[in-house]
């Protein structure tokens, strides 16, 4: 029997609370009485503050807030570029951007170790051969690769690195491009990125598959660990590429003065990053990657929601790098941007970034060294773009001019694997997982002075809550230094009154807030309460009632992007549709492709991690409770995973006391890295968090 207003939540915590509520409303004789329920628990709509919006994709106020931040940062970068007056100014800017990029990825390994290359097989093709290669980019980190070598050994050949995009079979997926390059006389190396192809890090040998998909999911798990350690997954992807260059330089067939790179999608990301940081790259052609960060932040939830941390470098926007900065780091070397008009990397962003870099190339006499090609098609390295790219490579490598593309002879995947089992970590007993490497990276640095959480919170703030004006809302949106409160309505059940408020702040944001208090026993003690999904609902009434009976008023509120401010939309991964079949709560917060994960990564790009924005929201709620609701003392608590946030609130704001929860523990970022923990609530992702105490 279900009374009107009960909501059956599919996630476990909500289900537990439903049973708690049922227990509270069940008489000793086992009879369930709906009239009694009405007296005990307020109706569901008493907990709803905002007008519900139709389900579906939308630019929410929080997403718009993130985009506004990114555009302001992009405009600041453009002003810096416009101030460049000489080539010396440009090179100085280039050095600054390079240093920022190195800092964002956590630096590069300090020394190069032995590659220990070995060939595991060879296939003879028409005019070239394909060698199956395994080398070590770091001790115990085995890289599986294919090397395409022209049969003509009478002269040295230019070489091309082809980093793989997000394909399950990694390097093999790009064999057509590699064959075409080899047919033109290039030595080509294509390798599996970590987490793809033969380099799964979470392979279940019995099930003969990874615990995650081999497109982006392993990158998400590893990348989130890397963030906590103070680095980025891109650090190790770039290093694999640099070591691939080292390998090419050991080949007698290779002309070391003519090393080039091209790749598409995730391979385009790697091509841009490797070329930016390795001056040995002569020519670069990144495909289907270069765009504009604000535009990319605005569309990826809807068209490409999969988490890919190596593309979301911490402070990439706020540090003035962005995609144009990666092109700047190529100057004055030749670079071509290959784009798809119908790509989910917005074409207008690609055109914008290209033109900004082009102006600098032109201003200092290098106009012929930068180019762009566009194909009218979706996300792919099309034949027309490949032809333009190969012509560009030929021109700057002194190769004969050719027309058209060679017809590739595609080989089955099984013929192109480098290992016996198909997975290098299965074959190599001495292999190290990247999670181990990330842990080692952290351990080498954990002796450094600890970082205080409060210091991190108070730096890089978009809003100074303590100095903002707290005023009544009069219909005019707030300025950046205002918090405007609006009383929506009040209702009562027995002696309990629930006041619904909206706090307008940060120009665009709204915070739904409930003030729950006992009319007959007014108190000045207040507890802030929330769970991992936001403010309280009717299912949480047994928990709230305990605080009311203990003499507390309750203030419960939604953090930006959670609760009633969630986007009513399930992001569907094109690479793993099963993620879209999760119930709404779990799909929304899924760390591999959920809406919340995309909000979190957007926040990293703009320099203020979502976790700190949640803390900012709690400071706003606390100040409102003190100055408007008359709270003389404030405590905070939360059940389950949300206790981590409650603990952080009490640590940063000493005026707020933490009320402990039975069996509740706060996550420790350092322990997550030490344990190589694969998942945790994505909203608690803090770059460098393992070093925070």
Q: Positions of the model-derived regions?
A:
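Primarily recognizes the serine-hydrolase "nucleophile elbow" in alpha/beta-hydrolase
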Residues: 243-318, 621-685
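Generic beta-strand/beta-sheet core signal
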Residues: 148-150, 163, 191, 262-264, ...
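Alpha-helical scaffolding within the catalytic cores
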Residues: 313-327, 358
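Alpha/beta-hydrolase-fold serine-hydrolase catalytic core, especially in secreted/extracellular enzymes
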Residues: 39-142, 331-512, 516-527, 532-553, ...
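Cap/lid segment of the alpha/beta-hydrolase catalytic domain
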Residues: 155-242, 247-250, 293-305, 522-624, ...
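Bacterial N-terminal signal peptides
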Residues: 19-30
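Cleavable N-terminal signal peptides
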Residues: 25, 35-36
């Amino acid at each position: 029997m279900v009374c009107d207003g009960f909501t059956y939540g599919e996630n476990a915590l909500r289900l537990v609370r439903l049973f708690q509520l049922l227990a509270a409303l069940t008489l000793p004789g086992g009879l369930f009485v709906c009239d009694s329920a009405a007296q005990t628990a307020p109706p569901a709509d008493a907990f709803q503050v905002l007008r519900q919006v139709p389900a579906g994709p939308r630019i929410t106020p929080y997403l718009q807030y993130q985009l506004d931040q990114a555009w302001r940062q992009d405009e600041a970068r453009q002003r810096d570029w416009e101030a460049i007056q000489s080539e010396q100014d440009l090179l100085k800017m280039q050095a600054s951007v390079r240093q920022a990029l190195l800092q964002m990825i956590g630096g590069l390994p300090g020394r190069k170790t032995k590659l220990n290359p070995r060939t595991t097989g060879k296939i003879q093709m028409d005019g070239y051969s394909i060698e199956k290669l395994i080398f070590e980019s770091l001790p115990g980190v085995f890289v599986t690769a294919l090397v395409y070598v022209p049969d003509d050994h009478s002269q040295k050949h230019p070489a091309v690195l082809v980093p793989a995009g997000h394909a399950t079979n990694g390097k093999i997926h790009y064999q057509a491009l590699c064959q075409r390059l080899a047919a033109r006389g290039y030595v080509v190396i294509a390798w599996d990125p970590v987490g793809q192809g033969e380099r799964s890090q979470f392979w279940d040998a019995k099930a003969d598959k990874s615990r995650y998909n081999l497109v982006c999911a392993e990158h998400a798990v590893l990348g989130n660990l890397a963030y906590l350690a103070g680095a980025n997954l891109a650090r190790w992807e770039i290093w694999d590429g640099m070591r691939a260059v080292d390998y090419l330089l050991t080949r007698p067939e290779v002309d070391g003065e003519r090393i080039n790179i091209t790749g598409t999608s995730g391979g385009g990301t790697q091509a841009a990053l490797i070329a930016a940081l390795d001056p040995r790259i002569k020519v670069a052609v990144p495909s289907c990657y270069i765009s504009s960060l604000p535009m990319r932040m605005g569309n990826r939830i809807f068209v490409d929601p999969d988490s890919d941390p190596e593309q979301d470098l911490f402070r990439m926007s706020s540090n003035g790098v962005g995609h144009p900065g990666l092109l700047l780091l190529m100057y004055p070397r030749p670079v071509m941007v290959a784009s798809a008009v119908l790509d989910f990397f917005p074409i207008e962003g690609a055109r914008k970034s290209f033109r900004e870099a082009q102006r600098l190339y032109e201003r200092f006499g290098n106009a012929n060294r930068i180019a762009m090609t566009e194909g009218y098609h979706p996300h792919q390295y099309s034949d027309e773009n490949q032809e333009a790219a190969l012509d560009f490579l030929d021109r700057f490598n002194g190769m004969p001019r050719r027309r058209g593309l060679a017809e590739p002879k595609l080989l089955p995947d099984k013929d192109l694997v480098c290992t016996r089992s198909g997975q290098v970590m299965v074959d190599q007993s001495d292999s190290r997982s990247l999670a181990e490497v990330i842990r080692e990276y952290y351990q080498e640095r954990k002796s450094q002075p600890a970082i205080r959480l409060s210091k991190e919170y108070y730096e890089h703030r978009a809003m100074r809550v303590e100095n903002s004006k707290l005023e009544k809302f009069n219909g005019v949106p707030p300025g950046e230094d205002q918090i405007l409160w609006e009383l929506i309505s009040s209702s009562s059940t027995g002696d309990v009154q629930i006041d619904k408020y909206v706090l307008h702040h940060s120009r665009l944001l709204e915070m739904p807030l409930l003030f729950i208090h006992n009319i007959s026993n007014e108190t000045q003690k207040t507890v802030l309460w929330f769970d991992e999904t936001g403010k309280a609902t009717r299912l949480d009434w047994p928990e709230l009632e305990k605080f009311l009976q203990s003499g507390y008023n309750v203030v419960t509120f939604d953090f930006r992007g959670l609760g009633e401010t969630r986007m009513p939309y399930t992001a569907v991964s094109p690479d793993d549709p099963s993620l879209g079949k999760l119930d709404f709560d779990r799909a929304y917060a899924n760390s591999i492709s959920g809406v919340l994960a995309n909000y979190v990564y957007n926040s990293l790009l703009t320099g203020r991690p979502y976790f700190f924005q949640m803390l900012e929201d709690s400071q706003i709620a606390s100040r409102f409770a003190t100055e408007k609701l008359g709270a003389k003392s404030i405590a905070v608590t939360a059940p389950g995973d949300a206790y981590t946030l409650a603990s952080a609130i009490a640590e940063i704001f000493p005026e707020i006391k933490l009320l402990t929860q039975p069996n509740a523990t706060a996550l420790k970022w350092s322990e997550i890295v030490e344990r190589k923990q694969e998942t945790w609530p994505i909203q608690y992702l803090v770059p460098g968090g393992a070093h925070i105490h």
